């Protein structure tokens, strides 16, 4: 039996980047073609997916030595963990009983125009009634559920990238 060689650090970083691009393209397809408008938590999840992707792209371009790999791995993992937390909150909101769903709030542009930055960020991460709607599901998981699964995968690969020797 022949043992195949694992992808290099740079190749794996590019695979992570490509995966993040694919996730964002899927989100844009759902928004623009299917007409599924993103709620504030959806947009927040996109931001953290973009964060993981950009960190991985920079890591691929830089192709650092051991310490740099740990730094990039930690940064990508941090972005992934925060994104997974936002996804988990989103799934939690979607599974609340109807009488406990928070009221619908303002849209994202209004939040950042009308409120100080920290207050707008608190509102953004809290989510609102718009975030509780399940607009589509596949194999029993809503879009935020699948995003959570994607974040778990990105976190696992990012941790491995930070810990790998070669």
Swiss-Prot record:
Q: What does this protein do?
A: Required for disulfide bond formation in some periplasmic proteins. Acts by oxidizing the DsbA protein.
Q: Name one GO biological process term.
A: protein folding
Q: Kindly give the membrane topology term recorded for this protein.
A: Multi-pass membrane protein
What does the sequence similarity comment in the record state about its family?
Belongs to the DsbB family.
Task: Please indicate the ranges of residues that lie on the Periplasmic side.
Answer: 30-47, 89-145
Chain ranges passing through the membrane? 13-29, 48-64, 71-88, 146-164
Cytoplasmic face of the membrane = 1-12, 65-70, 165-166
Q: Which PANTHER family does the UniProt entry name for this protein?
A: DISULFIDE BOND FORMATION PROTEIN B
One short Pfam family name for this protein? DsbB
Q: Which GO terms describe its cellular component?
A: plasma membrane
Q: What is this protein called?
A: Disulfide bond formation protein B
Q: Could you tell me where this protein is found in the cell?
A: Cell inner membrane
Q: Which InterPro entries match?
A: DiS_bond_form_DsbB/BdbC, Disulphide_bond_form_DsbB, DsbB, DsbB-like_sf
Write out the entry's keywords from A to Z. Cell inner membrane, Cell membrane, Chaperone, Disulfide bond, Electron transport, Membrane, Oxidoreductase, Redox-active center, Transmembrane, Transmembrane helix, Transport
Q: Cite a single GO MF annotation.
A: electron transfer activity
Disulphide connectivity of cysteines: 39-42, 104-131
């Amino acid at each position: 039996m022949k043992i195949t060689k694992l992808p290099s650090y740079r190749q794996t970083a590019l695979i992570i980047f490509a995966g993040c691009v694919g996730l964002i393209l899927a989100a844009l397809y759902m928004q623009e073609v299917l007409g599924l408008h993103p709620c504030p938590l959806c947009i927040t999840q996109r931001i953290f997916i973009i964060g993981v992707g950009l960190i991985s792209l920079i890591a691929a371009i830089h192709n650092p030595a051991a310490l740099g790999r740990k730094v990039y791995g930690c940064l990508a993992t941090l972005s992934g963990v925060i994104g997974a937390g936002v996804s988990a909150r989103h799934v939690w909101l979607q599974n609340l009983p109807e009488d406990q769903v928070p009221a619908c709030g303002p849209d994202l542009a209004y939040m950042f125009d009308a409120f100080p930055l920290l207050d707008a960020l608190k509102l953004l991460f809290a989510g609102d009634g718009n975030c509780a709607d399940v607009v589509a599901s596949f194999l029993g998981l809503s879009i935020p559920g699948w995003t959570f699964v994607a974040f778990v995968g990105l976190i696992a690969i990012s941790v491995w990238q930070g810990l790998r020797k070669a």
